[in-house]
Amino acid sequence: MTPQIQEKLDEIEKINLENKYLPKDREWITSGPFQIDRSEYVLGEKIFLRIGGLGFDEIGQVAFLRPLNSTHYEIYLTIPFDGSNKSAFNYYLQPQLSKIRGFCSVEDFVGDWRVVFRGTDYPNLEFKITEDILPGDENNYQPVC
């Protein structure tokens, strides 16, 4: 191994030790047939939505709402569901900066999010995105606007 390679490996090891990132355990927060895997995420982590056991007559949308401030939310993404078509499926979501969509900096994602199940009476789910960034994803969260 050349000294340059060893130096690079030592640098990577140092960065890993400084970050001390460990993903939180999955909690599977549930509302009816809908589940998300955690109550808290860092930027860069994927949010895992699991839907299982939809009734044949259950039709609607899962709406992910991002915080605008302490009292107002805005739709980030909607995912349609139709139990007569498919009673179970999974979906991964990873909030990403986008100049086109107006998501310019990490401040657009940090805070308490809600998941609303339109067309049903199931209670909302809530989760938090912190200002921490998944190690290695820092460049993906530099301001774009």
Please place each PLM-identified region on the residue numbering:
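Extracytoplasmic/secretory-pathway segments with low complexity and glycosylation-like composition
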Residues: 1-145
